[in-house]
Amino acid sequence: MKKTIRLSLLATAVIVLASGFALHASLTASAASAHSARGAAGSPADSMLHATFTDSAVKGTHGQGLVELILTGTGTVQGFGAATDVVGVVEDFAASPCGPGGASNSSQDRIAVHGGVLELSTTGMNCVTASGPQVTGTYRVDGQASTGIFAGARGAGHFTVSAATGQDTLSGTLILAEPGA
């Protein structure tokens, strides 16, 4: 039984890791480059985030039904250029909202570009489907923790990750604070 649980947790850690890679492999949200729209806060062009990352695990631990991972990577954010990200992920397999093999999922994402750091908080669930593990959930922009051009930003949206294919989608909003506000 102990061996089965360990193998299950190891398999889950691999799924979580793949989910983390996928979530940050292609970060896409609806609406235009926030950097170019900085002077026009509130315009439709001020509500899009598009970024791509390739992440790798720095550290992973498991115990008590929890898997914790730290992921880092590099990529680009449209309108900002080169970027790095650091992601702390926690999956709780004792709280499976979608049945056996599933888990609740949360992460804190830090995306750094020249000009600022964007902080995102996510919550979701990792579910086993016929096409492989799927992670779905929501994200929220943390404007108080964000810095530089992202300080005071707000926004929210949804994300979907297919750990099996490495494909993911994040869609929602990013509204920058007005300069001097």
Where are these regions (language model features)?
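N-terminal secretory signal peptides that target proteins for export/translocation
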Residues: M1-I5
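Sec-dependent N-terminal signal peptides
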Residues: R6-F21
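Signal peptide processing junction and immediate N-terminal pro/mature segment
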Residues: A22-S36
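Beta-strand-enriched cores of mature, soluble protein domains
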Residues: A32-A181
